[in-house]
């Protein structure tokens, strides 16, 4: 079976950071696109709860929903194309006529805008910037790369 790939643009804030969400604690934070795209970072530590997880588990639900909508629209278009070809051949003999209406696309949600309630934090251990809420900063955050704490 062939594999397909789609590309989505995840919105960045004015500082070039993208909003992420931990799969475990559901805490949100922001990480630079450069850090996120670095192939050396296969796993990240959640800056909020400190638990490690695979990089691709930190997408926000809004981004995952948009990806699902894009994939659904593509699948519906492909199914329609295949059935249309089948019906054309079926309708040639004139005894039975079949038709099919093109399915409506699932509306692709506009990409959300990250909340603007984050505070820029510099983590000296790995020399990176992240954003977390003031509350998370007050109780301490973890470095997403090495897991070290910033209290």
Task: Describe the predicted segments one by one.
Residues 1-11, 24-34, 99-110, 122-130:
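Short Cys/His-rich Zn2+-coordinating modules
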Residues 29-32, 55-56, 129-135, 149-151:
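Short, non-ligating residues that shape and space the ligands of small metal-coordination modules
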Residues 8-19, 34-41, 107-120, 131-137:
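Short, flexible, mixed-charge glycine/proline-rich loop motifs
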Residues 22-25, 46-49, 121-127, 143-146:
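Short cysteine-rich clusters marking metal-coordination/redox-active sites
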Residues 48-67, 74-84, 148-151:
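Short metal-binding segments enriched for Cys and/or His
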Residues 1-11, 68-103:
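N-terminal alpha-helical interaction blocks
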Residues 39-53, 137-149:
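Cysteine-rich micro-motifs
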Residues 1, 121-124, 131, 138-151:
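Acidic, proline/glycine-rich low-complexity IDRs
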């Amino acid at each position: 079976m062939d594999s397909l790939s789609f590309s989505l643009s995840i919105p960045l804030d004015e500082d070039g950071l993208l909003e992420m969400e931990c799969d475990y604690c559901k805490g949100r934070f922001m990480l630079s696109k450069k850090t996120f795209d670095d192939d050396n970072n296969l796993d990240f530590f959640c800056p909020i709860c400190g638990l490690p997880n695979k990089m691709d588990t930190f997408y926000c639900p809004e981004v995952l929903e948009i990806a699902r909508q894009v994939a659904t629209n593509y699948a519906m278009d492909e199914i329609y194309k295949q059935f249309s070809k089948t019906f054309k051949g079926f309708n040639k003999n004139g005894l039975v006529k079949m038709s099919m209406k093109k399915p409506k696309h699932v509306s692709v949600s506009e990409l959300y805008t990250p909340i603007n309630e984050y505070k820029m934090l510099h983590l000296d251990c790995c020399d990176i910037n992240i954003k977390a809420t003031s509350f998370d900063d007050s109780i301490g955050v973890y470095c997403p790369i090495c897991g070290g704490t910033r209290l």
